[in-house]
């Protein structure tokens, strides 16, 4: 499986509580924070729901 590099590019202030929970579930805490995760269908679903807050690199 590939790894994805996920970076938070927008603030979570004013977002839905569900989207904030998704950010924390991915391990993102603040703007500019980057995490590396294994690519999986579950992860892609999480990213899809908060696509306006994050940037993805393969």
Swiss-Prot record:
Belongs to the universal ribosomal protein uL30 family. InterPro entries: Ribo_uL30_ferredoxin-like_sf, Ribosomal_uL30_bac-type, Ribosomal_uL30_CS, Ribosomal_uL30_ferredoxin-like. It holds the Pfam family Ribosomal_L30. Keywords: Ribonucleoprotein, Ribosomal protein. One of its GO terms (cellular component) is cytosolic large ribosomal subunit. GO terms for biological process: translation. This is Large ribosomal subunit protein uL30.
